[in-house]
Regions:
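Radical SAM/AdoMet-radical enzyme domain recognition
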Residues: 1-87
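Auxiliary Fe-S-binding modules of radical SAM enzymes
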Residues: 79, 89-92, 96-251
Length: 251
């Protein structure tokens, strides 16, 4: 995504957009076209630059697939001073046919290249307490949000000595964070999904169009959220009920 961002960044800022995530899995044009089916890498990079110029905070999302050139991604994000999150491959849609890597192993490789996290000093949590990152645990904690400056999502953020921006890890496969998951997803068709692993959700568009409804939209959403599954079952693909590709799920 991000192909049209350069054209609309200024208007999006004026409309009130307060942040944007851009998917970027490679900086090689041939590999980009192989992954996306489109020769649009330069358009995406131009979009990222335009968002920065419009003063829209940007984060880069990079899926950790088998042949990921993570060093080029880190060198780029470090140069443009944008935080990056490495996301473990999930068995959703086409992702089920790919071999993903462990973020824990990637973490160690990054340390070998850019220095140990423990040598990067300390950062402060929202309460002002100092902490040191535990390299054995890439699951979400409030402290690993780096004072909340990157939002309240599931990424665990770290600062490596050789980099001047934060590196996040979203490790749904090897460090399940379902207990602290605070995410729901609203699709372009008005469907509220409670978990990427399951089809279950609620059609908010139908609720809005029901002239006889007795509940407010907020009440309906609250009830749905309390039905959020306890955890995903990505490790047991046969139990998944969501079979659409991410491009179809959207949201």
């Amino acid at each position: 995504n991000g192909v049209l961002l350069a054209e609309y960044a200024k208007a999006l800022k004026e409309a009130g957009l307060d942040s944007v995530n851009v998917s970027l899995d490679t900086l090689d044009e041939t590999e980009f076209q192989r992954l996306t089916g489109r020769d649009e890498l330069n358009a995406v990079l131009a979009g990222i630059n335009a968002a920065k110029e419009a003063q829209i905070p940007v984060k880069i999302n990079t899926v950790h697939y088998q042949h990921l050139d993570w060093k080029s991604i880190l060198d780029y994000t470090n140069r443009v001073q944008i935080p990056v999150r490495f996301i473990e491959m999930m068995p959703i849609g086409y992702g089920a046919a790919y071999t993903g890597g462990s973020n824990e192993e990637l973490f160690r490789q990054i340390e070998e290249c850019y220095g140990n996290v423990s040598e990067a000093g300390t950062v402060r949590s929202r309460e002002g307490k100092k902490y040191s990152a535990d390299i054995r645990d890439l699951s979400y904690t409030e402290e690993k949000q780096q004072s909340g400056k990157h939002g309240a999502g599931p990424a665990a953020y770290y600062r490596f000595p050789g980099l001047n921006m934060d590196v996040g890890f979203i490790s749904a496969m090897h460090h399940k964070f379902c207990r602290s998951c605070n995410r729901i997803r609203l699709t372009s068709e008005g469907y509220l999904k409670l978990c990427l692993c399951y089809e279950k959700g609620i059609d908010l568009r139908a609720v809005l169009r029901d002239p006889g409804r007795k509940q407010t939209l907020q009440e309906v959403m609250k009830e749905a959220i309390f039905e959020k599954p306890a955890e995903h079952c990505f490790e047991q693909v046969s139990e998944m009920t969501e079979h659409n590709a991410m491009v179809r799920i959207g949201g």
